[in-house]
Amino acid sequence: MKNIKKLLLLITLCLPMVSSADCEKWIDQLLEKYHSSRESDMPVCKIWPADESKTIVVLPFPRGSDDSIFYDLDVLLIDTQSGEVIAHNWEPDAFVSDAIQLVGFGIDTARYQLNSESRAFGVRVGFRGSSSVYPFYEQQINLYVQQNEKLNRIVNQLVLKTSGGEMYNCKGEFHNNDAVLLLGNSSTNNFKDLIVSDKEQKGIIKVNSEGECVEEITESTKRQYILYYNGVEYPLPEPIY
């Protein structure tokens, strides 16, 4: 059980929720200029390594009660030197935080080169359950690509990681899914196909002969899914797992 908790913590820490100091100054200025009546929670920013003249900014805006908090999301691409907005995407009710709590946002600048001219970036979102008996963690990703003054969301809430199970007094079971998003060799509607390569593990938690609480993997499965661009977005299969 301790190992499961460590795994959940490790996955959470893998979500880069801390902004680069080089771009943090723009967060307050953007909030004051465009969202002066609202308070942002867990904003992040990152200078884009693929084009350091541009900076990616994610501004989440919570609203609602403690039981259910809805997050409006403003994703912006700005000029690194001036802070001027180049393109953005505004999405009301983008995410909800309830019994499964939203714990942070991160910016993914992996090489999502969709064609010779278009390169996407990702926004990762982490969720975590509050139960120690039924631990749960999930990480989703959205992908965005610039088109003139707009940032088009082309992948919506693709689940990349899940971890959970049921355990009490060193008895129980667990399951983990860990997926990576890769570029395929083929293209559809001028954008590269995306390969979701997933590894699923299931197992049990028990006391071994030495009285130690250990985990034992009983099943391991690898799968792949291909996402095809339809001219607007990459629709996700149902269910992805």
Q: What label would you give each PLM region?
A:
Residues D22-Y71:
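Solvent-exposed N-terminal domain segments of exported/luminal and surface proteins
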Residues M42-E52, L102-E117, V180-N189:
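Structural signature of eukaryotic scaffold interfaces centered on beta-propeller domains
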Residues A21-S37, E138-N152, Q157-Y241:
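Acidic, small-residue rich beta-repeat scaffolds with periodic aromatic anchors
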Residues A94-N142:
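Extracellular-facing segments of soluble proteins and assemblies that are Gly/Ser/Thr-biased and enriched
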Residues M1-L8:
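Bacterial N-terminal signal peptides that target proteins for export
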Residues E52-P62, Q113-F127, T188-K199:
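Acidic/hydrophobic-patterned starts of short beta strands in beta-sheet-rich repeat architectures
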Residues C14-V18:
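N-terminal signal peptide c-region/cleavage motif recognized by signal peptidases
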Residues L59-N115:
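Short N-terminal edge-element motif at the start of the domain
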